């Protein structure tokens, strides 16, 4: 007899993306978002800092913040969503918090994070299926 949790794990594995980069809070990432406008499909980049990571299996989400024309813009992306076509980790930062919500109250140079210099693996650009 199959356990209910085993059935859910099989379904989640079927719909999850397996080639995801290691995303951490404080990373500067570039996401490729597939957008359909007037019958045409294009990929729109969204580049920003990961301020929160909520791990929940197939429902894992990241909150990405960027400053656009002097206004802070935050978007929450489900990592396993079909609209995400690519994820690039551009830079890692050294942070000591799990959530960087304090960046919302800071402006200008105060929003900079200390960069962590580490050797990145050669495959950081992941084209997701």
From Swiss-Prot:
Keywords: Plastid, Ribonucleoprotein, Ribosomal protein
UniProt cross-references to PROSITE patterns, sorted A to Z: RIBOSOMAL_L19
GO MF entries: structural constituent of ribosome
Pfam families the record matches: Ribosomal_L19
Localization (cell): Plastid
GO biological process: translation
InterPro entries (UniProt xref): Ribosomal_bL19, Ribosomal_bL19_CS, Ribosomal_bL19_sf, Translation_prot_SH3-like_sf
GO CC annotation, single: ribosome
Family, as annotated: Belongs to the bacterial ribosomal protein bL19 family.
Record NCBIfam families: rplS_bact
Classification via HAMAP family: Ribosomal_bL19
Identification of the protein by name: Large ribosomal subunit protein bL19c
Species lineage: Eukaryota, Viridiplantae, Chlorophyta, core chlorophytes, Trebouxiophyceae
